[in-house]
Design a protein with these regions (language model features):
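Substrate-binding pocket helix/loop in short-chain dehydrogenase/reductase
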Residues: 72-74, 78-86
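Conserved NAD(P)H cofactor-binding loop of Rossmann-fold oxidoreductase domains
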Residues: 64-71
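Conserved amphipathic alpha-helix within the SDR
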Residues: 44-58
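Canonical Rossmann dinucleotide-binding motif of NAD(H)/NADP(H)-dependent dehydrogenases/reductases
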Residues: 3-36
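A short, exposed helix-loop element centered on a Lys and neighboring polar residues
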Residues: 97-98
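Active-site loop of short-chain dehydrogenase/reductase
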Residues: 9, 57-58, 105-110
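Rossmann-fold cofactor-recognition segment
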Residues: 36-46
Length: 110
């Protein structure tokens, strides 16, 4: 990754306030990218599409999905807790990709 190839690129970073989000934002910005840092939970099925629409042109999508480290022992994780983890860390991924791909395909870039 060089500053030259990131200069002016619009980078959408999800969960920008969690896990690797702050560092990702800083590194992309240091290399000249325009960082669109989002910290919304993206739990609602329509949230990823709304985020991409509000971001406008997205050259690079960084799907940083995070949640606090679990404290429940693995043998005691309930179905509800597992569903919440899955909804936070997995469900947004295909929704984000589906939302951003059409514009990238149209531009033949991204």
């Amino acid at each position: 990754m060089t500053s030259q190839n990131l200069a002016g690129k619009r980078v959408l970073i999800t969960h920008a306030d969690a896990f690797m989000g702050p560092t990702l934002c800083a590194v992309f910005a240091e290399h000249g990218a325009i960082v669109i840092a989002d910290s919304s939970p993206l739990l609602a099925p329509e949230a990823p599409a709304a985020l991409v629409e509000s971001a406008g042109i997205v050259d690079i999508l960084v799907v940083n999905l995070a949640l606090p480290a679990p404290s429940t022992p693995a043998a005691e994780v309930s179905d509800a807790e597992w569903s919440q983890v899955f909804a936070t860390l997995v469900d947004p991924l295909p929704r984000l990709v589906r939302a951003v791909l059409p514009q990238m395909i149209e531009r033949r870039s991204g």
